[in-house]
Amino acid sequence: MATGKIIQVIGAVVDVEFPQDAVPKVYNALEVENGANKLVLEVQQQLGGGVVRCIAMGTSDGLRRGLKVTDLDHPIEVPVGKATLGRIMNVLGEPIDMKGDIGEEERWAIHRPAPSYEDLANSQDLLETGIKVMDLICPFAKGGKVGLFGGAGVGKTVNMMELIRNIAIEHSGYSVFAGVGERTREGNDFYHEMNDSNVLDKVSLVYGQMNEPPGNRLRVALTGLTMAEKFRDEGRDVLLFVDNIYRYTLAGTEVSALLGRMPSAVGYQPTLAEEMGVLQERITSTKTGSITSVQAVYVPADDLTDPSPATTFAHLDATVVLSRNIASLGIYPAVDPLDSTSRQLDPLVVGQEHYDVARGVQSILQRYQELKDIIAILGMDELSEEDKLVVSRARKIQRFLSQPFFVAEVFTGSPGKFVSLKDTIRGFKGIMDGDYDHLPEQAFYMVGTIEEAVEKAKKL
């Protein structure tokens, strides 16, 4: 193993000089002995003259010129397999839950090629989430990729936690959760939520939170993905949750600037599309097993045309768009049924009835959207009888799209509901057909099935 020495430290970027005949490869891991602390660096560029430019995977506090650096001669490797289940690890796969060693049998490098074209498999099976608006409007495919788009504070993490709770309990497979640049408090809440739901022994948790250096946040998504790939290659159907994919892009922007690359649009790194592609192309299903991924995507300033969310859109099968306008009406989950889409919403995949009900719901809501201006200026009385009926049904549909969540029980005080797809379709079909025109609209707010709405109406 070749050794070199640090010649420059600028924040998270460290330049290391090696002998000319032993220069480490790009993406190799280097180890710095800094007193009791061991710091891992990852080679990003070879500058010539035996000098390599690296990104630190931990804090560079206390580093100084002249410190000895060892080339480990392989990329960062992390534990994979069943030993990782129920544990919290950092970007290097080291345990951070005070429960001793992982005790893994195998370690894999975090940089791996994506599966080859002939190994890929696609699936038409639907994944039932138990959340009405998602199952109806933007159904998820098993082995597909789903993005949860939303600005600050509209409920991405709560939706993500509800999905994990519902799918992990209903679906008996393994899950991997990568917390990329999110709040440590949320990571803590999430751990206890999994523990209380008795699904912790089926989830591997990898955290690189907001307080970590950019190198750490940039690589932690790959660490989680590598663990998911191992489960997939064993022939399992695995779930990969990433919260938040935007922070992965942001960490890439920070690293890119530190490495001296010229920024592109809005200050993002010039390699934005490539970095996103490298990650997303590995999140895929093969003939041996599948990875179904759910990714939260922060939308800066609620602008979906920002380069980061816009680049992410291209890779997804289903997009769930969370809207601030809907959240302000108190309707949670604040999913925008007119903006959310799924490739699976096709009569050949979901069946004709599901397709017709979903499109019918969207057309009623769209018509209501158009009538809002008239109502604001002239009032409801100026509408035709037909339009009054559309508005009344649209408002019921809008409220029926809300649902109490299990993970939000402590805030709402009402028990969570898991609604089967069959009940969801039946409920919305009934509202559209006018079976519930006699019920007041508040009966449809925060209930599970349509029967609950009927019961609630009796109490009003």
From Swiss-Prot:
Its main location: membrane. Pfam families: ATP-synt_ab, ATP-synt_ab_N, ATP-synt_VA_C. It is found in: Cell inner membrane. This is ATP synthase subunit beta. It is an enzyme of class 7 (translocase). It catalyses: ATP + H2O + 4 H(+)(in) = ADP + phosphate + 5 H(+)(out). HAMAP family: ATP_synth_beta_bact. GO terms for cellular component: plasma membrane; proton-transporting ATP synthase complex. PROSITE patterns: ATPASE_ALPHA_BETA. InterPro entries: AAA+_ATPase, ATP-synt_VA_C, ATP_synth_F1_bsu, ATPase_a/bsu_AS, ATPase_alpha/beta_chains, ATPase_F1/V1/A1_a/bsu_N, ATPase_F1/V1/A1_a/bsu_N_sf, ATPase_F1/V1/A1_a/bsu_nucl-bd. It comes from the Bacteria. The lineage of its organism: Bacteria, Pseudomonadati, Pseudomonadota, Gammaproteobacteria, Enterobacterales. It comes from Serratia proteamaculans (strain 568). Its EC number is 7.1.2.2. GO terms for molecular function: ATP binding; ATP hydrolysis activity; proton-transporting ATP synthase activity, rotational mechanism. Belongs to the ATPase alpha/beta chains family. The gene is atpD. ATP binds at residues 150-157. F-type ATPases have 2 components, CF(1) - the catalytic core - and CF(0) - the membrane proton channel. CF(1) has five subunits: alpha(3), beta(3), gamma(1), delta(1), epsilon(1). CF(0) has three main subunits: a(1), b(2) and c(9-12). The alpha and beta chains form an alternating ring which encloses part of the gamma chain. CF(1) is attached to CF(0) by a central stalk formed by the gamma and epsilon chains, while a peripheral stalk is formed by the delta and b chains.
